């Protein structure tokens, strides 16, 4: 092989190795769990390895209307079934508005999209939401628990929010206690319903049939089972009908004798 040809071959090999190196780097990042789907601000889907992001929004308005804003981001690892939450603190305007809503017995609402990682629009599939009295959130110092209910297809079918402690007792709360959320999150996977006990039912029927075959006493006819009740009834009817038959015969004989005497 000539020198120029050997040099061209080595150059081609170097180019192939260089092209394969970024691919391995990307693969190692995925294996290490660095890639996440839907972790952006909008909770949209990107490349990932089994982790999806959900945008958590909340709403608390003076007129009790629903105007949702971002509260934080939920990260759901679908491989190990874990759920985590990152959220921002309330600013001064939001703290004041939350106090006003609580004073008016208004509601504090939360919502998450039904389809994790789905873009906004018709494909988003809508939202699931929940609410608590705003006064209970204020008096709990923003301590709440979020539970995410999911189905086997990986869709969100429900969300619930509760405050600790719950209830509204009219306690005074300092402004510093309404800055940071103290939230615990929980993932509620689908519960498999128990299947019909067909096999157990068939086995029980077979055992009953085998027991009847071993005990022929249960195979007797109706008369064989209840003859001790039937025979006395028949004898009683026969004996009670005998005098009536004799009386009818005597009356017939008397009539015949009177006729012969004429």
Curated annotation (Swiss-Prot):
One of its GO terms (cellular component) is endoplasmic reticulum membrane. The keyword Transmembrane helix applies. Residues 243-262 are cytoplasmic. Residues 26-221 are lumenal. It is a single-pass type I membrane protein. Pfam families: ECM10 (PF21203). GO terms for biological process: angiogenesis; positive regulation of angiogenesis; positive regulation of endothelial cell migration; positive regulation of endothelial cell proliferation; protein insertion into ER membrane by stop-transfer membrane-anchor sequence; tail-anchored membrane protein insertion into ER membrane. It is found in: Endoplasmic reticulum membrane. The keyword Cell inner membrane does not apply. Residues 1-25 form the signal peptide. The chain crosses the membrane at residues 222-242. Coiled coil: none annotated. Keywords: Angiogenesis, Endoplasmic reticulum, Membrane, Signal, Transmembrane, Transmembrane helix. Part of the endoplasmic reticulum membrane protein complex (EMC) that enables the energy-independent insertion into endoplasmic reticulum membranes of newly synthesized membrane proteins. Preferentially accommodates proteins with transmembrane domains that are weakly hydrophobic or contain destabilizing features such as charged and aromatic residues. Involved in the cotranslational insertion of multi-pass membrane proteins in which stop-transfer membrane-anchor sequences become ER membrane spanning helices. Belongs to the EMC10 family. Component of the ER membrane protein complex (EMC). PANTHER family: CHROMATIN COMPLEXES SUBUNIT BAP18-RELATED (PTHR21397), ER MEMBRANE PROTEIN COMPLEX SUBUNIT 10 (PTHR21397:SF4). This is ER membrane protein complex subunit 10.
């Amino acid at each position: 092989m000539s020198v120029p040809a050997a040099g061209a071959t080595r150059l081609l090999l170097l180019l192939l190795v260089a092209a394969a190196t970024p691919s391995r780097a990307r693969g190692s990042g995925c294996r290490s769990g660095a890639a996440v789907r839907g972790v952006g601000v909008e909770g949209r889907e990107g490349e990932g390895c089994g982790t999806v992001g959900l945008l958590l929004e909340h709403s608390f308005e003076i007129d009790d209307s629903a105007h949702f804003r971002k509260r934080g981001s939920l990260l759901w690892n679908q491989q190990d079934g874990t759920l985590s939450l990152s959220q921002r603190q309330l600013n001064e305007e939001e703290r004041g508005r939350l106090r006003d809503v609580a004073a008016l017995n208004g509601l504090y609402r939360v919502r998450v999209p039904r389809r994790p990682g789905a873009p906004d629009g018709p494909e988003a599939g809508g939202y699931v939401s929940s609410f608590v009295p705003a006064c209970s959130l204020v008096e709990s110092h923003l301590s709440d628990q979020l539970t995410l209910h999911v189905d086997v297809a990986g869709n969100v079918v429900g969300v619930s929010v509760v405050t600790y402690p719950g209830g509204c007792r009219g306690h005074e709360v300092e402004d510093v206690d309404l800055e940071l959320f103290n939230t615990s999150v929980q993932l509620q996977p689908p519960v498999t319903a128990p299947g019909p006990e067909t096999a157990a039912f068939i086995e029980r029927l077979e055992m009953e049939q085998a027991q009847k075959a071993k005990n022929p006493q249960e195979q007797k006819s109706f008369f064989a089972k209840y003859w001790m009740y039937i025979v006395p009834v028949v004898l009683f009817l026969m004996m009670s009908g005998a005098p009536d038959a004799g009386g009818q015969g005597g009356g017939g004989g008397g009539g015949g004798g009177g006729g012969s005497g004429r």
